[in-house]
Amino acid sequence: MCLTITVWVLLMVLAMQGYLRNPLADPGLFGISACAALGAVLSIFFGLAGVPFALPLFALIAAALGAGLLMLLAGRSGSLILFTLAGVMLSSLAGALTALVINLAPTPFASAEIITWLMGALTDRSWHDVLIALPLVIVGMALIMLKAADLDALSLGDLAARSMGVDMARLQRVLIGGIALCVGGSVAVAGVIGFVGLMVPHMVRPLVGHRPSALMIPSALAGALLVVVADMVVRIAPVASEIRLGVMMSVLGAPFFLALLLKMRRELA
């Protein structure tokens, strides 16, 4: 299950980093992951979390709505600036609505359940949760893989990509659709587990190069190994209550992110 979910996460992150040409790009930049989390939180708020498949369905629907709103706001120009600004706005809006739902939770138990779920974990998940999201995620993965060559061309710059026949507006729409399906599936199953997509590609790039298409499979395997090890650590750690996987990944990811920023600053100096 770790392998399956991590593959979803890594593919969408690599697509995002390739499209934005920013090695620090993260799913939160699009706002779709925040929308998926909002959908899952709403299912808990309305007491539907116990209904079979309700939580993943809410997350997938919210991710799809977020993707539609993102495409509407970004327009048809394919502009990276508009796309990024629309994603930041969408992420802020979904985050604010999630905080509002937590604030309006009918009982302290509902509020605690929402916060616990948002921390991300695999301990209480099953293959039933994965299977409901799997068909849509397969479509999302296929959309991303079909555009792998366009992402490689885009790494040479906008003008070079256009001269090679890349339709920027179409590429944007296809990637938003693929990323929305992968984000919705991963958040629906595991909650919010951050920094995996940020750390793993940087570990793999020195070994396989910088082409997005060459990074996809090695990053997925390396990411799965990282998540499995982190999940084992949080399960056996000698603490009073189990540390959530999302918390552990954030503890590992924040120093890694800082090291990347310092490295980039030295290179630019």
Model segments located where?
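Alpha-helical transmembrane segments in inner-membrane proteins
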Residues: 1-269
